[in-house]
Amino acid sequence: YPGVYLFPSFTSNSIDGGGMELINQISKSVERMQLFAEETDALSTSLFSDTYNLAYDQDGRISLPESLIVHANLENKAIFVGQGRKFQIWNPDDFDEFKKKAKIKALEHRNLIGPVELSNEKGMDKD
């Protein structure tokens, strides 16, 4: 599918986005919750009812829906922040403040990063 999925972030005034793989991952996470629990209904409704499936135009651009523009406080500029499996779109001023706080949190929780096993695919030795 030549497009992207976007939805308002739950944790900040930014826009979360990604491809079908992200949507599938979110769906699987919700499916692991109790089927008829109130929390499951609230989460799945909040996630999926506000998700936009947007196609790229002939120049590879998308147009953001007004509700996402308002949620992220976007005006003349936006910043795109890659985050591995997903990305975020921010008002640059809001992102600067978030980034400062994120660095502090990252230092506090750096022990959550587990060891990484290096492969020998590109001539890297494990020893």
Regions found by a protein language model. Give the residues of each.
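Flexible "stalk/tail and boundary" regions
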Residues: Y1-N53, Q58, S67-D127
